[in-house]
């Protein structure tokens, strides 16, 4: 399978290059030159299959350039070996359902891709006898999932940037108490967008890239986005629901659903649910591309203003030249504040959107607990609020994280006497470095510790 950049379709890249680079050399994101298509008969034949078999079916066209079938099967089984016996589960909330994606090691949906990505790199690096330096920016869950998945793996050092004092305490401790010698935590005095911009600068810096082999652990990495399509496939095959409500910040999770749709799965509507940082909702509903400063909310993993994976979708609609111009201008806030009407119409054909305030989120946590005895984390609550505001029925709302990760918000709404059915202890001391939003300081820290 060949890959191209979202900003240049003239140069082909191999799966191995995509795995090594993370970000395309021109600053774009990697996408397949041609997305594999499955027939409806092939898809229907998956009904009754387990999660491992569905994963193998979806991943094999992308991984066979790197591994043989036996190794792919081993990677999948080892990746999910630390999950609960029930890898995914479903709960009813009246007219709609919850797809519970908190059965992994760090109790968030990021585990489903990150554990697989770690195994892909582990097997690949053994094969080629190479060392890699993984870089990631996180608003909370990506960092903890990456650290849990990659800690202790030979030939890998992992550096994670998070916005200082902008994650939940639980999220921060999941990142900072690993005790692993190959893990380096950076608390940046800035926003998630600042963290993400520094990561992208690292990939473009010629001097650092001559010294280190960088690759991305964020969803800018194609092999991070791809595995998330598996749980949408499992949900469709097991629940017969083809509409999904996805709490959205960086657009990676819902792009994975769109990818599955592009592969032939009969997905109907994809509903983008945002908090007050609602650029995705504004683009889809009103064609409004204005950028605003990040607002802190009670769903911090979605406190994002520039949604990186949106570039993958727009590359399909706009083509590489217009995509390159748009995102280069966005980085300088010099872009047009509206998309061409034909492009906006394509968005509207595939996506609905809505947004939720922090107050609405708190009310939803309270109402869902009182009516169904189900605890929602605030990000999941964003999705449920949006489904109700759109008056949607028979949709699958993604439950992105276990509520124990966001006890501050849950306890504010429901009090302290809540049974989370999870007993989590952080036994190691926290270890992280606080840095200013400065590229040179970050580069010096990496040189000192890598």
Where are these regions (language model features)?
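PLP-dependent amino-acid enzyme catalytic core
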Residues: 1-450
């Amino acid at each position: 399978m060949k890959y191209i950049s979202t900003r240049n379709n003239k140069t082909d890249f191999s799966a191995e290059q995509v795995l090594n680079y993370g970000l395309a050399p021109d600053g774009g994101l990697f996408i397949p030159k041609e997305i594999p298509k499955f027939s409806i008969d092939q898809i229907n034949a998956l009904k009754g299959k387990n999660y491992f078999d569905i994963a193998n079916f979806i991943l094999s066209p992308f991984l066979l350039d790197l591994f043989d079938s036996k190794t792919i099967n081993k990677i999948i089984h080892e990746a999910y070996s630390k999950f609960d016996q029930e890898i995914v589960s479903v709960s009813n909330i009246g007219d709609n359902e919850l797809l519970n994606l908190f059965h992994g090691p760090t109790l968030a949906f990021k585990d489903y891709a990150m554990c697989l990505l770690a195994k892909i790199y582990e097997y690949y690096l053994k094969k080629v006898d190479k060392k890699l330096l993984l870089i990631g920016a996180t608003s909370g869950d990506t960092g903890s999932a990456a650290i849990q998945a990659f800690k202790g793996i030979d030939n890998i050092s992992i550096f994670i940037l998070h916005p200082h004092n902008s994650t939940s305490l639980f999220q921060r401790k999941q990142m900072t108490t690993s005790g692993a010698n190959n893990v380096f935590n950076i608390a940046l005095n800035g926003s998630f967008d600042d963290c993400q911009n520094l990561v992208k600068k690292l990939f473009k810096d010629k001097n650092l890239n001559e010294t280190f082999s960088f690759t991305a652990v964020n969803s800018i990495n194609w092999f991070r986005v791809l595995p998330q399509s598996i749980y949408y496939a499992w949900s469709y095959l097991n629940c017969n629901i083809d509409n999904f409500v996805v709490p959205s910040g960086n657009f990676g999770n819902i792009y994975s659903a769109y990818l599955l749709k592009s592969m032939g799965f009969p997905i109907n509507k994809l509903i983008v649910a945002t908090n007050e940082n609602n650029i995705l909702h504004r683009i889809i509903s009103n064609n409004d591309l204005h950028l605003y400063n990040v607002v802190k909310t009670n769903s911090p993993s979605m406190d994002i203003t520039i949604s990186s994976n949106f570039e993958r979708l727009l590359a399909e609609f706009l083509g590489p030249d217009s995509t390159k111009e748009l995102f280069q201008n966005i980085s300088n806030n010099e872009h047009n504040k509206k998309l061409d009407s034909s492009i906006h119409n394509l968005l509207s054909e595939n996506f609905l959107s809505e947004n939720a305030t922090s107050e609405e989120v708190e009310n939803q946590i309270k109402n869902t607990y009182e009516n169904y005895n189900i605890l929602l984390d605030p990000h999941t609550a964003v999705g449920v609020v949006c489904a109700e505001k759109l008056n949607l029925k028979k949709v699958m709302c993604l439950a992105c994280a276990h509520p124990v990760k966001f006890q501050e918000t849950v306890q504010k709404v429901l009090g302290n006497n809540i049974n989370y059915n999870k007993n989590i202890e952080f036994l190691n001391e926290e270890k992280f470095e606080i840095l200013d939003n400065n590229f040179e300081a970050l580069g010096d820290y990496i040189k000192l510790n890598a």
